[in-house]
Amino acid sequence: MAKALFFNFCISLLIIAILVSHEIIPTEARHLRTHRKSIKNSTLTVHEGAGGLRTGGGSVKTDISKEEHGVDEFRPTTPGNSPGIGH
């Protein structure tokens, strides 16, 4: 009787150990740093004025002719000829 009780106790202890260790997930990851190094600038330069900047002088084409932007170019294919995703 004592052997059966001891055996049942060991089996139940083993089952509990397996259930508890199953909840612990082993992870392999890099360690995150808690302290960051502060980077200090040795010199501080302030730019005054816009001496090197260009202002104006550019042109933008705003009108699109019908030859460049035709209606037939953007129509969807018919359902029978659709290549599908990834083809």
Swiss-Prot record:
Propeptide: 30-72
Glycan-modified residues: 41
Compositionally biased spans, kind Gly residues: 49-59
GO molecular function terms attached to this record: hormone activity
Record PTM: The mature small signaling peptide is generated by proteolytic processing of the longer precursor.
Bias (Basic and acidic residues): 63-75
Subunit structure: Interacts with CEP receptors (e.g. CEPR1 and CEPR2).
Single GO biological process annotation from the record: regulation of root development
Name used for this protein in its record: Precursor of CEP8
Xref: InterPro entries: CEP (IPR033250)
Induction: Triggered by nitrogen depletion.
Alphabetical keyword list: Apoplast, Developmental protein, Glycoprotein, Hormone, Hydroxylation, Secreted, Signal
Function, as annotated: Extracellular signaling peptide that may regulate primary root growth rate and systemic nitrogen (N)-demand signaling. Mediates up-regulation of genes involved in N uptake and assimilation pathways.
Residues that bear Hydroxyproline: 76, 79, 83
Organism, scientific name: Arabidopsis thaliana (Mouse-ear cress)
Region listing for Disordered, in residue ranges: 41-87
Tissue: Expressed in lateral root primordia and in lateral roots excluding the meristem region. Also present in the aerial tissues, such as leaf petioles and the shoot apex region.
Gene Ontology CC annotations of this record: apoplast; extracellular region
Gene name linked to the record: CEP8
Signal peptide: 1-29
Lineage: Eukaryota, Viridiplantae, Streptophyta, Embryophyta, Tracheophyta
Record-stated family: Belongs to the C-terminally encoded plant signaling peptide (CEP) family.
